[in-house]
Amino acid sequence: MPIITLPDGSQRQFDNPVSVLEVAQSIGSGLAKATIAGRVNGERRDASDMISEDANLEIITAKDEDGLEIIRHSTAHLLGHAIKQLFPNVKMAIGPTIDNGFYYDIDLDRSLTQEDIDTLEKRMLELAKTNYDVIKKRVSWQEARDTFESRAEPYKIAILDENIAKDDQPALYHHEEYIDMCRGPHVPNMRFCHHFKLMKVAGAYWRGNSDNKMLQRIYGTAWADKKQLADYLHRLEEAAKRDHRKIGKALNLYHMQEEAPGMVFWHNDGWTIFRELETFVRTKLKEYDYQEVKGPFMMDRVLWERTGHWQNYADLMFTTQSENREYAIKPMNCPGHVQIFNQGLKSYRDLPIRMAEFGSCHRNEPSGSLHGLMRVRGFTQDDAHIFCTEDQIESEVTSCIKMVYDIYSTFGFTDIFVKLSTRPEKRIGEDVMWDRAEQGLANALKHNGLEYEIQEGEGAFYGPKIEFALRDCLDREWQCGTIQLDFALPGRLDATYVAEDNARRTPVMIHRAILGSIERFIGIITEEYAGFFPAWLAPIQAVVMNITDSQADYVQKVVKQFSEAGLRVKADIRNEKVGFKIREHTLRRVPYMLVCGDKEIVENKIAVRTRKGTDLGTFSVEEFVEILKQQVRKRELTLLGE
C-alpha cells in the first residue's frame, strides 16, 4: 500500500501499486490530461510506470522544462515512425534531444532533399494528429536484440551489444508499428507532439568517429504549443537578419578565407571597433588596479609539459620546431603570467598582484566547428590572473564580480545568469582547501546579492569556478565571463611568495576573463545591436555631406572641427543627390548624418538626422561636437532623439 507524498506535502495512500498517471487522475482529470511523466523520488519516470513503495512524486507537464525535453525526445521517435513509413529500408541510429529540439541520425542509401524533408514533416503531423498512445514495454536484452535483428536495425543492435548489460531490461517504445529503444521517459500519447518543424539535414559520423560511416542527421525543433513554436521560428528569422557574418560583410568589418581557416582579417572599420573595446577595458583595468603585461606567443614544450597542457591539451595546440627544440603556440595566457610573477622575490605585502593581458592565443579547433567570429582558431583574450593568498580569495572574487557587471552593463547586458561549478570527482588538493575555496566563491556571490545555480562536480580538477552567461535580445545565452580558482598551476611552475612567518608559500591564482575572446564578443554585440553600434563604438560616428558643390569647402571645415575633437567623422562631397547619400550611409548604419546647405553655411550650423531617420533639426557645429563628445565619453547606448 504505497503512500505518495506530493510537492505540497499532502499524501495519498493506495491499496495497490499505482502508476504515475493514476496518481494524477486521483488528483483531478485536468492534471491527468496534462500529465507527461513524473519525478519519483527525483527520478524521471514514464506516466505508465508503477509505484509500489512509498515515494515522493512530482507530476511533469508541458509547463515544466523536463516536460518540454520529453516532448522533444518523443518527437524524435515520431520522426523515426514517419521516416520508416516513407523509406522502409532506412536504418535508425540515435535520436537525442538538443537545445531547442532534437535530431535523428539515419543510414539511407540516398541523400534527403528538401522535398523529402517537407514530405516527412507532413507525414509526422498526420501521424501525431491521430493521437495514438505510446506503449512502453520492458523486455530482456535478448528479446530486444531479436526485435531489432528481425527489423534489420544494425545500429540499435550495436547499442545493445556495446552499451547495455545483458542482465538489463531495456525499454522498447511502441509507436504503433514502429519500435524504438530508449531510457525514456516519453509522452504517453502523441497529442503532446503536434508543434514541431524539421530544420535541416547534415552529415554526422556514427559514434562521432570519422573512421565510421557517414550518416544523415535530421535536425528538428519541437515545442509545447503553437505560440512557442511560432515565437522560436521568429527568433530564428531575427537571428538570421542579425547574423554577424552577413553584417560584418555588409559593413566591411572583417573577412575570413580558406587559406587561413579560423583566422580573422580585420578591415579598418572592424579594427576600429576592436581597438575601442581594448581602450574601454584598459580604462577598467586602471580603475580596478591591474597591471597590463605581454607574454610571448610561443614557449618551449618543456614548460607546457610542466603545466599539464602537453598531456591534456595537445590536440588543440599548434606546434612548431626550431633548432631541435619543440615549441607550442600558446592556447592561453596563464603559464606566461606565472613566469612574470616568478621574476623577483614576492612578499605577502605585494599580494594581490593583478596581471592582465590582451593575449593573442591560438587553438586548433576542428574545422567543422568554426563559425565566423564565434568560433575561431586565432583570438584575443581579455585575460587576467590574480595572485593572492587564500584569505584574499573572497575579496578578490568580489572585485572581479563587480568588474564583470560594470563592463557588461556598459553594453546593455543586464540579464546575466550565474553558475557555480564545484569540485569534480577527480581533483587535486585536500577537501578542506576545496571547502574554503567553494565557500569563498559562494560568499562573494551572496555578498553581491547574486542568485546562482550550482553545477555539482563541474569545476576543473584544480579549482571551482563561477561562470557568467549573457542573455541577448533574442533570448539566447552566451557564456562569456569566468572566475576560476587554480590551486595547481602556481605550484607546478614553482610560484612562491614569502609569507608573514617568513615561510615560502604557493599563491592561489584566480583566472579572470570578462569579454572572453574579443573576436567572439564583437560577434555577440554585432548581433545584439544588429550592426547599429552605439556612437562610441561605431567605426564612423558621423558623415558630413553637402547638397551642392558650393558647400564642399564648408563640409571639409566641419569635418576638421569634429576630427580635432577626437571624433571619427568623414566627408561625403560626391556629386550625388543628398537623398542618395543619406540612404547609403543609413545602410552603413552610421549614427549621424550631418547635412550642409547654403542656409547652414550662413548660420554656421549643420542639419542633423539619425540613421533611424529622425530629423533632429539644426545645431551649431560647436554644439553638436560637444553633444557627440559627451555621448562617446559616457559610452551611451542610444543616439540623440532615440
Swiss-Prot record:
SUPFAM superfamilies: Class II aaRS ABD-related, Class II aaRS and biotin synthetases, TGS-like, ThrRS/AlaRS common domain. Its cofactor is Zn(2+). InterPro entries: aa-tRNA-synt_IIb, aa-tRNA-synth_II, aa-tRNA-synth_II/BPL/LPL, Anticodon-bd, Anticodon-bd_dom_sf, Beta-grasp_dom_sf, TGS, TGS-like. GO terms for biological process: threonyl-tRNA aminoacylation. It comes from the Bacteria. Gene3D superfamilies: 3.10.20.30, 3.30.54.20, Anticodon-binding domain, Bira Bifunctional Protein, Domain 2, Threonyl-trna Synthetase, Chain A, domain 2. Keywords: Aminoacyl-tRNA synthetase, ATP-binding, Cytoplasm, Ligase, Metal-binding, Nucleotide-binding, Protein biosynthesis, RNA-binding, tRNA-binding, Zinc. Zn(2+) binds at residues 334, 385, 511. Residues 1-61 form the TGS domain. PANTHER family: THREONINE--TRNA LIGASE, CHLOROPLASTIC_MITOCHONDRIAL 2, THREONINE-TRNA LIGASE. Belongs to the class-II aminoacyl-tRNA synthetase family. This is Threonine--tRNA ligase. It comes from Histophilus somni (strain 2336) (Haemophilus somnus).
